[in-house]
Design a protein with these regions (language model features):
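Intracellular loop-helix junctions on the cytosolic face of multi-pass helical membrane proteins
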Residues: 1-15, 109, 114-129, 137-138, ...
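Helix-loop boundary and gating motifs at the non-cytosolic
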Residues: 5-63, 258, 262, 266-290
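Loop-to-transmembrane helix entry/capping segments in MFS-fold secondary transporters
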Residues: 50-51, 152-162, 382-394
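Helix-to-loop junctions at the C-terminal end of transmembrane segments
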Residues: 66-83, 316-329, 413
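Intracellular juxtamembrane helix-capping segments at the cytosolic ends
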Residues: 137-150, 369-383
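C-terminal transmembrane helical hairpin of 12-TM major facilitator-type secondary transporters
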Residues: 330-373
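A late C-terminal transmembrane helix in Major Facilitator Superfamily
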Residues: 384-416
Length: 447
C-alpha cells in the first residue's frame, strides 16, 4: 500500500490489493446466484404452486433488509484482529452457515416429506431463509471494505472489479447444472425430488465459497481503528457512538435518496426475472407448464445457460464501466439501464431459445450498471462515519423493491392472465422508469 493520500486521506491502493479485497465475492455470488436461479425450479419441483411463488421470493429481500444494517452497525464498532479485523469476522461467520445450508437446500425433496407436502415446502423455505441470512452476512463485508479502504479516485474501479467478480461467480453458478448434465449427472429425478445435476451444483458452489472467502480473509489486512480514523478524517470514537438508524437516515446525503429511487425500479424488475424466468421460458419456448416434465427441466437448464449469458455480458460490461471517468457515471448508469429495459421487454416476444441469448445479454448490461454505480455514487458522498451502517441501510433500496414486487405479484400475476411471460413486459416498463430516474442524481464528493 502506498502512503500517498487523496483529498479524503485514503491511500492509493495497488490494483492487486483491490482485487484481493473483492476476491471472496466470487464465491458469495456463486452461492447467491445458485439460490436465485434455481429456487423457482426447486420449489416447483417439490410441489409449490406457481401462483404462490411470490411468498418464497419474499425471503431473500426480507433477510437482507434485516441483516445487512445490523451487520453494518455492529461491524462499525468491531475490532477483532485475531478474526480479521472489522468486517472480516462477519464474512467468516456467514461463510460457515452458508456452506451448511447449501448442502441442505437442494435435498429438500429427498427427506421423505412427500411431493407438495407442507413439511417439504416449510423445510425448503426455512433452508432458503438461512441461506439468505448467511449470504447477506457474507456479502456485506466486501461492500463495506471498499468504502473503508478505497479512495474516491479508485472507488469506481474497485466496485467495477467487485461487479466483475460477482458476475463471474454468477456465470459459474448458472452453467453448473447444465455442465453437470452434459457430463452425465442425472437431470431428472422421481416426482418431488430435485435432480442430481442441481444438487451437485450446490455442493461445488459451497466449496468455491469456502476457498474464495478464505483467500480474502488471509490476504487482506483491514485498517486498525486509529489508522481508519486518520485516513477518514474522523475521531476514533465516532463509530462507537450509537446514533439511531432514523437519525442517520435523516442526515443521509441527497445522493443516497436519488440513487434509492433508481434502485427501486431496477430491483422491482429483477425480482420478476428471478421469479418467472424458468416458467416463462418453459411456456414460450418448450410450450409446457408442467414442472415435473422433462421439457420443463430442459427449460430450467436453458435458463441456467441464459443466466450465464447475462452474467458474461455483465462481466464484460462491468469491466468497461470500471474504466469510465467519474464525469460520465450518469451516462453509463442510465444507458446501461435503458439497454436492460429493452432486454426485459424482448423476452415477452421471443419464442426461440437462441434469440433469448440476446435478450439476456441486454439484461446483463443493466445488471452490470446496477452493481457498479449505486455503491460508487453513495460511498463517494459519505464520510467515514458509520460507513457500514449507511451501506447496510442502503441495502434497503435493494430489498424493499423486491418485497413490494413479490407482494404486488399476487395482484399483478392474475391481472395479467396468470402468464409468467406477461410479467416480463411489465418488468421492461419498470426498468425503463429506472433509466429515466437516473436524471435525478447529482453526484457529490466528500472533501
Amino acid at each position: 500500500m502506498s502512503s500517498q493520500k487523496t483529498t479524503t486521506g485514503l491511500p492509493t491502493l495497488s490494483k492487486s490489493m483491490i482485487w484481493m479485497i473483492n476476491f471472496g465475492f466470487l464465491g458469495v455470488q456463486t452461492a447467491f446466484t445458485l439460490q436465485s436461479s434455481q429456487m423457482s425450479r426447486i420449489f416447483q419441483t417439490i410441489g409449490a404452486d406457481p401462483n404462490n411463488l411470490g411468498w418464497f421470493f419474499l425471503l431473500p429481500p426480507l433477510a437482507g433488509l434485516i441483516v445487512q444494517p445490523i451487520i453494518g452497525t455492529y461491524s462499525d464498532r468491531t475490532w477483532a484482529p485475531k478474526l480479521g479485523g472489522r468486517r472480516l469476522p462477519y464474512l467468516l461467520l456467514g461463510t460457515i452457515v452458508a456452506v451448511i445450508v447449501m448442502i441442505l437446500l437442494p435435498n429438500s425433496g429427498s427427506f421423505g416429506f412427500g411431493y407438495g407436502s407442507l413439511a417439504a415446502l416449510w423445510f425448503g423455505a426455512i433452508t432458503v431463509a438461512f441461506l439468505d441470512l448467511s449470504s447477506n452476512v457474507a456479502m456485506q463485508p466486501f461492500k463495506m471494505m471498499v468504502g473503508d479502504m478505497v479512495n474516491d479516485d479508485q472507488k469506481s474501479y474497485a466496485y467495477g472489479i467487485q461487479s466483475f467478480l460477482s458476475n463471474t461467480g454468477a456465470v459459474l453458478a448458472a452453467i453448473f447444472p447444465f455442465l453437470f448434465t452434459f457430463l452425465g449427472v442425472a437431470n431428472t429425478a422421481k416426482k418431488g425430488v430435485v435432480p442430481q445435476s442441481v444438487v451437485v451444483a450446490f455442493y461445488v458452489g459451497a466449496a468455491l465459497l469456502v476457498i474464495t472467502s478464505l483467500f480474502t480473509m488471509l490476504k487482506v489486512k483491514e485498517y486498525d481503528p486509529a489508522t481508519y480514523a486518520l485516513y477518514h478524517g474522523i475521531e476514533e470514537a465516532d463509530n462507537q457512538k450509537g446514533e439511531s438508524w432514523l437519525t442517520l437516515l435523516k442526515h443521509a446525503p441527497k445522493a443516497f435518496w436519488t440513487v434509492t429511487l433508481v434502485q427501486f425500479f431496477c430491483w422491482f424488475a429483477f425480482q420478476y426475472l428471478w421469479t418467472y424466468s424458468a416458467g416463462a421460458i418453459a411456456q414460450n419456448v418448450w410450450h409446457t407448464t408442467n414442472a415435473t416434465s422433462a421439457a420443463y427441466q430442459a427449460a430450467g437448464n436453458w435458463y441456467g445457460v441464459l443466466a450465464a449469458v447475462q452474467s458474461i455480458a455483465a462481466v464484460v460490461w462491468s469491466y468497461v464501466l470500471a474504466k469510465v471517468p467519474n464525469q460520465y457515471h450518469k451516462l453509463g448508469y442510465g444507458g446501461s439501464l435503458l439497454i436492460g429495459a429493452t432486454g426485459f421487454a424482448s423476452i415477452f416476444f421471443v419464442h426461440n431459445q437462441y434469440v433469448l441469448i440476446l435478450s439476456y445479454a441486454l439484461v446483463g448490461i443493466a445488471w452490470a450498471g446496477m452493481n457498479t454505480y449505486p455503491l460508487t455514487i453513495v460511498t463517494n458522498a459519505l464520510t467515514g462515519k458509520h460507513m457500514g451502517t449507511y451501506l447496510g441501510l442502503f441495502n434497503g433500496s435493494i430489498c424493499l423493491p423486491q418485497i413490494v414486487a413479490s407482494l404486488a405479484s399476487f395482484a399483478l400475476f392474475p391481472m395479467l392472465g396468470g402468464s409468467q411471460v406477461n410479467m416480463f413486459l411489465l418488468a421492461g416498463i419498470v426498468m425503463l422508469l429506472g433509466a429515466l430516474s437516473v436524471t435525478t442524481i447529482k453526484e457529490t464528493y466528500v472533501k
